[in-house]
Design a protein with these regions (language model features):
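Bacterial Sec-dependent N-terminal signal peptides
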Residues: 1-20
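Conserved beta-strand hairpin/beta-sheet module of binuclear metal-dependent hydrolase folds
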Residues: 24-75, 153-166
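Short, hydrophobic/aromatic-rich segments at coil-to-beta transitions
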Residues: 34-39, 129, 138-140
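Short N-terminal helix/helix-N-cap motif within the alpha/beta-hydrolase-1
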Residues: 42, 67-68, 93-95, 149, ...
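Short glycine/proline-enriched coil/turn segments at helix->beta-strand junctions
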Residues: 54-55, 77-80, 96-101, 157-159, ...
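Metallo-beta-lactamase
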Residues: 57, 64-65, 138-198
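Active-site HxH/HxHxD metal-binding segment of metal-dependent hydrolases
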Residues: 65-138
Length: 198
């Protein structure tokens, strides 16, 4: 499993090095990672992804602080947009206020009072195996509790891409104290992820 995660991290690094910047301000730099895929790198070293299909687009995570994120996304794509948070921590869901509807896993609703109590929009709940069909491109939800109870990864199986938030990929095991996730839960998610990567 460590070998697979290392390969994934190296591939991501190689793609990021060759990325072309399409937008930059003091809070975020947006780069074209590959065709119809942009990475948003923020001042606090978190990342968001914009994935575009033929019919619509998906923004994965919203970062901590990025003024007018909706307008920045609108400069890149004019397609209807779905917004998904990989988990309900402020560095991944801090700018949900710019969007009327946000997809999250129901298990992370325990974090909403602490991290998104002021959100005026609507939460939509995604489930294991749910597919977001963008037109010519699909993202499948895989529930990976551990970092938070509702952590998810999004798999673009056709292109071999995985968008994991903080569930995996940082090189560290980062479990949270409140709410506490048993190490066994994280281990189960690691085993499931390893199977998905094969």
């Amino acid at each position: 499993m460590k070998r697979n995660l290392l390969i994934f991290a190296l591939l991501f690094l190689c793609m990021a090095i060759g990325a072309q910047t399409v937008f930059k301000n003091e809070e975020v730099e947006v780069s074209l990672l590959k065709e119809k895929t942009w990475v948003f790198s923020t001042w606090d070293y978190t990342t968001m992804y914009l994935i575009e299909g033929e019919d619509k687009a998906v923004l994965i995570d919203t970062g901590t602080r990025c003024a007018d994120l909706d307008k920045i996304v609108g400069q890149i794509t004019g397609k209807p947009l779905e917004v998904i948070v990989t988990h309900m921590h402020p560095d991944h869901a801090g700018c949900i206020k710019y969007f009327d509807k946000v997809w999250m896993h129901r298990a992370d609703t325990v974090l909403v009072p602490q991290h998104a109590a002021d959100y005026q929009g609507e939460f939509l709940y995604m489930e294991e195996g749910q597919v977001f069909d963008l037109g010519g491109r699909k993202l499948e939800v895989a529930w990976m509790p551990g970092h938070t109870p509702g952590s998810v990864v999004l798999l673009d199986k056709a292109n071999g891409d995985c968008y994991s938030g903080d569930a995996f990929g940082s090189g560290e095991v980062w479990l949270q104290c409140v709410p506490m996730s048993p190490i066994a839960t994280f281990h189960e998610s690691c085993c499931r992820m390893e199977k998905l990567m094969k």
